[in-house]
Design a protein with these regions (language model features):
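Expand to "…catalyze enediolate/carbanion chemistry for C-C bond making/breaking, isomerization
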Residues: 1-86
Length: 86
């Protein structure tokens, strides 16, 4: 298991710099992952991203040291567990 860069930054008392993704595209996710963010959040609540888009986007982000995160569209345990499995 790789180290969580965001946790390390927070423990050091520094600010985590987060990017935001609302476009359902692995190309945009890969491009953003190469820009030096600490974390990238995939917005499934207000953007056009659904689970079928979010999973490959997370895979692309995970190929870098960036920590992928997701904002689910509702506080529903099933949706949260599904994206955690991604």
């Amino acid at each position: 298991m790789r180290k969580n860069k965001a946790k390390e930054i927070i423990k050091a008392g520094k600010a985590v710099i987060n990017g935001w993704l609302q476009i359902p595209s692995t190309v945009s996710a890969e491009t953003m992952a190469q820009q030096g963010w600490d974390t990238l959040t995939i917005d499934m609540q207000h953007g056009l991203v659904d689970y079928t888009n979010a999973m490959p986007m997370m895979q692309v982000i995970s190929a870098t040291e960036i920590v992928p995160m997701a904002r689910v569209n509702w506080n529903e345990p099933g949706q949260i567990m599904k994206i955690l499995d991604a």
